[in-house]
A protein has these predicted regions:
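Active-site-adjacent structural elements in enzyme catalytic domains
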Residues: 67-84, 117-133, 343, 347, ...
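Second-shell residues forming the walls of enzyme active-site clefts
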Residues: 27, 69-83, 95-97, 162-337
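Short, well-ordered alpha-helical
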Residues: 2-7, 13-97, 144-158
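Active-site mouth loops of central-metabolism enzymes
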Residues: 34-45, 108-122, 203-217, 287-294
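Preference for extracellular/luminal or secreted protein segments
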Residues: 1-54, 262-263, 272, 292-580
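Catalytic domains of carbohydrate-active enzymes, especially glycoside hydrolases
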Residues: 49-63, 122-139
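Short glycine-enriched loops at secondary-structure junctions
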Residues: 38-44, 87-97, 137-147, 187-193, ...
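Hydrophobic faces of well-ordered beta-strands that scaffold small-molecule active sites
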Residues: 32-40, 58-62, 85-93, 138-142, ...
Length: 580
């Protein structure tokens, strides 16, 4: 039986009665539907009505759209749902995770470089304000992973640090910021990512710490969040073999499952030992870390039977709903397990006051609330974060400051993620970099890029020959005073590790020029690029590819303000030459 008066619900008798009455009045289909958080592309009100009638979902996690479109969507969903919906958002960096016009404040890695936890608080504050203005009420954040392995790129920018103490301080501040708005938080990805280099989107993730080391790091962090009243926990498709073996002596290797399907991790450890009473939700169910471990018909009900309360997304909603319902009818999900899940789901809704707000017609704020999105106050917080966090990783050749009055002629070598679509027309971030360098007083010559040449001139061997041609060294030195190597590399769920990739083989983009003229490397995202360009002796982590981040980084490089961010040793990737 779930204690709804205890943390994190703190319900009074009236709210508990609403939970009990609601469950008592549900059909089996409605109970099954509450277990799902779905993402459906519903374009009209009729589409939304049909989705709700078919699946009776407990929650919504949407993807994309500007603030007005998201506000309309959330308003329409809530207006047509029998029960108030949990509407979830991913806001790792601020309000930009909730809508396309939201405010980017900083990445978690950027916040970890700050002198205090104020940046982490501001990320949560702005994320909560802007997301709640659209009607969202559930923050799928903070990311509580610990960045222990520099090769791990899936949490490189999303982790608040490489040790438990730094992460605990920052995620506590983030949650405090979010809680200034009517939103619940969700720590992810239990039992913890960042230990190995692989990505649970693509393979079974493995946290291979010993039980003792896990308890001293991830365990201590999760216990701190639970003690603080954390409302929900997202479970990663990540195995913890040492913990499973400790809790299930004799378990065979082939029986070790991701935490989403491991009752010893969810029920024995998280619920009973750690005392977590809040909602437990799976990570996205299309990820390989779960999808490749069991047949879909088994995995869907097994996740709930193992201890999850909610199931995130569906492969085919009709099919997954049928799998879940059959799991209930066949007893895979026991009546007690289903009851506990429903009590926690509805308990979270009551904790947020959604039942009262539904009755009052205030589940979604009026459209005027969208004035908070991208407001001057939030833009100022983004500028503050950039000013306090952008980090000079190294300047061993004492190239800084770069003075555009004396070193005016700049060569820009811009490296971007490899295009994945025929619709590619160039990276707009490069244009921003050029504009900001020119604003600072530089004249800018942009180095060729193979992908752009292929678009502009059509596929040709001449394009490769152009890219391989470095020209005469004497002419290069006579033409340029400084080179800016700017890296705008991002990746998601296509490869386990995302590394710097030059636009073609034997490319003239390679940093041979670092020995010819002063060269400054700037990363606009990942913090571990020195593994691929150790020969660049001046390197800056700017953390973001927004105009604010780019402008502030350039101003610091030019000596207009001091670098205030602090890098951890993970930026050097365990190599001696990256420090040179």
């Amino acid at each position: 039986m779930v204690d709804l008066k205890a943390k994190p619900f703190y319900l009074d008798d009236e709210a508990i009665q609403w939970v009990e009455n609601t469950i008592a009045g549900m059909t089996l289909d409605e109970k099954v539907g509450q277990l799902f958080v779905l993402m459906r592309r519903a374009r009209t009100e009729d589409d939304i009505k049909n989705v709700l009638a078919d699946y009776h979902q407990g929650g919504l996690r949407y993807q994309g759209g500007d603030s007005k479109a998201v506000h309309w969507q959330n308003t329409t969903y809530q207006a047509n749902s029998k029960l108030p919906l949990l509407i979830a958002v991913n806001c790792d960096n601020g309000g930009d995770g909730a809508m396309s016009d939201g405010t980017f404040i900083a990445t978690a890695a950027e916040a970890a470089a700050a002198p205090d936890t104020q940046t982490a608080y501001n990320i949560g504050l702005v994320a909560g304000r802007e997301a709640s203005a659209t009607g969202a009420n559930w923050m799928f954040n903070p990311c509580c992973d610990i960045y222990m392995n520099w090769r791990n790129t899936i949490v490189n920018t999303r982790s608040f640090g490489d040790n438990a103490d730094t992460v605990i301080k920052n995620i506590t501040a983030f949650i405090d910021g979010v809680h200034q708005s009517p939103m619940a938080c969700c720590c992810k990805h239990f039992p913890g990512d960042g230990v190995e280099e692989r990505d649970q989107h693509l393979v079974l993730g493995v946290n291979d710490l010993s039980a003792g080391d896990w308890e001293a790091s991830f365990g201590r962090m999760y216990r701190t969040m639970i003690d603080g009243g954390l409302e929900s926990m997202m479970i990663g498709h990540i195995a913890a073999p040492a913990l499973s073996r400790k809790l299930r002596p004799g378990i065979r290797d082939e029986e070790i499952m991701p935490a989403t399907l491991a009752p010893e991790l969810l029920t024995d450890l998280l619920r009973q030992d750690m005392g977590f009473n809040g909602v437990i939700i799976t990570d996205a169910s299309h990820m390989a870390g779960i999808a490749c471990m069991e047949k879909r018909s088994v995995a869907v009900p097994k996740a709930i039977a193992s201890g999850c309360d909610m199931f995130l997304f569906a492969n085919d909603a009709d099919e997954d709903f049928a799998y879940m319902k059959k799991g209930v009818e066949d007893g895979v999900i026991t009546p007690e397990r289903l009851s506990d899940a429903l009590h926690r789901i509805l308990g979270l809704k009551a904790h947020l006051g959604l039942h009262k707000r539904q009755a009052a017609g205030t589940l979604v704020p009026p459209e005027e609330a969208l004035s908070a999105v991208g407001c001057a106050e939030h833009r100022a917080l983004a500028e503050k974060a950039a000013e306090e966090c952008i980090t000079l990783v190294k300047d061993t050749q004492k190239n800084l400051p770069i003075d555009p009055a004396r070193q005016k002629r700049a060569r820009l070598v811009f490296i971007q993620s490899t295009p994945t679509s025929k619709a590619y027309k160039g990276d707009p971030v490069r244009d921003v970099v050029v504009e900001e360098l020119e604003r600072a007083g530089f004249t800018v010559s942009v180095a060729p890029n193979f992908h752009d040449l292929e678009v502009e001139k059509g596929p040709s061997m001449e394009n490769m020959m152009t890219m391989m041609d470095c020209g005469k060294m004497e002419e290069f030195r006579a033409s340029y005073d400084v080179v800016f190597l700017v890296l705008n590399i991002k990746g998601y769920a296509q490869e386990n590790n995302v590394r710097l990739r030059w636009s073609c083989n034997h490319s003239s983009e390679l940093p041979w020029y670092a020995t010819e003229v002063p060269t400054v490397g700037i990363s606009l995202n990942y913090t571990n690029h020195l593994i691929d360009v150790p020969q660049v002796r001046t390197f800056v982590n700017a953390y973001g590819n927004t105009r604010t981040s780019i402008r502030t980084a350039i101003e610091k490089i030019c000596g207009k303000s001091e670098f205030c961010g602090t890098a951890s040793d993970t930026v050097f990737c365990g190599k001696w030459d990256t420090r040179l």
